[in-house]
Amino acid sequence: WENDMDFSQFVIMFKSIYLEGFSRPQNGVRTVINLLLEKYKQVGGELRLGAGVKSIDVENSVVTGVTLDSGERIFANKVISSIGLPETMNISSEKADAPVTGNMSFTETILFFDQKPDDAGIRETIIFYNDDEKYHYQRPQTLCDYRSAVLCFPNNFDHDDYDEGIIRVTFIANFDQWNELDRPTYIQMKKEVRDQALALTAKLFPKFQANLLYHDVFTPKTITRYTGHFQGAVYGTTQKARDGRTGIRNLFICGTDQGFLGIVGAMLSGISMANLHGLMNGESA
């Protein structure tokens, strides 16, 4: 959604920000992922990396398995997809009406400093910033909307796993505009995003005089490259599949497009859908 939010996601955000507070596991979310991988292997799961799925094979509106980029076919009577609902329907061999692709995408700048934010009295773990009378939660007409941002301070959680000081700055961005740039311009505009992130940090925290050691910037194009999400859509389609079902029998969806929010939400979605449609055999599927 633009300039709006699904009510269930609003509830999650409200509780997280105002009632519970944000948290971060020691060593980051990788700790949780590693525990899940270990459990998956313990119960006999096989993890195949670097094996892209070319198509989801469907016959008579029933899923039969997948075909990999290598041409190998894997037969299965149930498939749970985490690549997004529009992306899932796009590679299904029997085409159906594709859900609307989400418009919301972002840039994120990760800044590494020789001092930690706490050294300058910065105690926050996250700041939602807006420098306009209204908050424009929508895809901008330019590469980025610098009127608002989210600033994160990973060092300020109970467990600080870093030697350097780290600040992450996120701006709302336009996928189409980034996607049209030639390579030299693309690199130059990433530098502009970094400069805007540094300028905002200096504006909000003038006492933070640390030296920048390293930085990295990802854009909507980066999101599409590493996730395959159309339009670099971080929160997926506005047409969520709450029960995980698609229009194809025994083809299920998990992750953001099933309706949960964030990294932890996506993992909980996978667990819920695997339990419901796999272990519990949620028939009427």
Q: Where on the chain are the PLM-derived regions?
A:
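A glycine-rich dinucleotide-binding beta-alpha-beta segment and adjacent secondary-structure elements
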Residues: 1-2, 12, 150, 203-260
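Active-site/ligand-binding neighborhood in enzyme catalytic cores
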Residues: 1-43, 50, 226-238
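Beta-rich nucleic-acid/ligand-interaction surfaces
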Residues: 46-47, 51-64, 68, 217-227
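Mid-domain catalytic core of redox enzymes
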Residues: 54-162
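Active-site-proximal substrate-binding core of FAD-dependent oxidoreductases
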Residues: 58, 279-285
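C-terminal segments that line or cap access tunnels to active or ligand-binding sites in enzymes
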Residues: 115-218
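A conserved FAD-binding loop/helix module that cradles the flavin
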Residues: 245, 256-281
